[in-house]
Each structure stands twice: as structure tokens, then as C-alpha cells.
């Protein structure tokens, strides 16, 4: 069975996007990229909400013609990886390897298939829907040293879920990576 894993940047006060969805507060460096790349390497498919799909679709393909760099390598990975996009309104996507899903419950069948992990990028509303199904196995949270005061909450309205801290890492820029697994 595949694991369903959430990967998210979060402010200290629990927001994963600013008041207008902006991400300009996210602190990144090469060590964080390398750490996230280790998680990404376990993925057999990317999982997106429609909003995240549109954001990723508008950004990553634009880097494919740039000189080689970490971003270009990731853009190539994004281009080829199967992308499970959950949306009730999308009817099709012109992006490579997109598999549309209408209902969050479809993730349960996806988990039963063979392959590497299913990695949710961002998509807080989808994370909450999957939490309601008790479908998420792991959380990789990059907690940023900032208080946003308002914005898009990561766990707003999520159901009570026990977690166990599997590992943590402190980065030079003050970001703390927390890896949680389902608790007992």
C-alpha cells in the first residue's frame, strides 16, 4: 500500500499562505531544498488541489528551457511525474500526465495501488478532506520563523488526529522541519 504524505511550508501561527495566498514569507535555502528533495524522491505521484495544480502548471513548465539548475531538475520531475489533481470543476488539463479526480475518497483506491508514495504539495483544503477520511500517513512540515497573523490556515477545521514526531531538523535560517507519522 502506498503512503499518502503531506509536504507543506507553514508559519509559526499555522498558516500555509498569506491573506492573498502569497508565499513570499517562505524561507528557503539549499539545505531545505535538499531535505525536501529527499521526501520528493519517495513519490510515485504528486497530489494537487485545483488551485495548486494551476499554480504549479503556471510556474514549473516555464523553467524547462533554462540552464540546468536544481529548479530545472525539479521542473523536469514535475513534468514527468503522474499528477493526481482533485477538482470538481476541472474537466481536463493540458498539462502532461494529469489524472483528474472528482472526489477526495478516490485517494483511498489510489493508496491501494502499487508504487511509491503519493505526495500532496500544499493544497490545505485537500489535506483537510483527506484527514476526514483518515487517509494521511505522514506530514513533512517546514515551519517558518514568522507570524503571519492571517492567511490560509493549514489545519483550519481539521479533525482531531494523533501524530507521532518521527524526526525534526533545524536549519540555519530558523526553519524547523517536522516529520510526523500517524500516532496510536
Q: What function would you assign to each model-found segment?
A:
Residues 1-184:
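Enzymes that bind and transform nitrogen-containing heteroaromatic metabolites
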Amino acid at each position: 500500500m502506498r503512503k499518502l504524505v503531506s509536504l507543506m511550508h507553514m508559519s509559526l501561527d499555522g498558516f500555509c499562505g498569506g491573506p492573498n495566498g502569497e508565499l513570499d514569507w517562505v524561507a528557503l535555502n539549499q539545505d531545505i531544498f535538499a531535505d525536501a528533495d529527499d521526501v520528493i524522491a519517495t513519490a510515485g505521484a504528486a497530489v494537487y488541489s485545483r488551485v495548486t495544480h494551476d499554480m504549479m502548471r503556471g510556474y514549473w513548465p516555464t523553467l524547462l528551457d533554462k540552464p540546468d539548475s536544481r529548479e530545472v531538475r525539479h521542473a523536469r520531475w514535475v513534468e514527468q511525474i503522474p499528477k493526481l489533481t482533485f477538482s470538481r470543476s476541472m474537466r481536463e488539463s493540458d498539462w502532461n500526465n494529469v489524472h483528474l479526480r472528482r472526489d477526495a475518497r478516490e485517494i483511498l483506491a489510489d493508496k491501494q495501488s502499487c508504487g511509491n508514495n503519493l505526495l500532496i504539495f500544499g493544497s490545505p483544503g485537500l489535506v483537510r478532506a483527506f484527514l476526514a477520511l483518515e487517509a494521511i500517513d505522514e506530514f513533512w512540515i517546514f515551519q517558518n520563523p514568522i507570524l503571519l497573523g492571517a492567511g490560509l490556515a493549514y489545519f483550519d477545521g481539521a479533525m482531531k488526529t494523533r501524530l507521532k514526531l518521527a524526526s525534526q531538523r533545524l536549519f540555519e535560517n530558523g526553519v524547523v522541519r517536522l516529520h510526523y507519522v500517524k500516532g496510536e
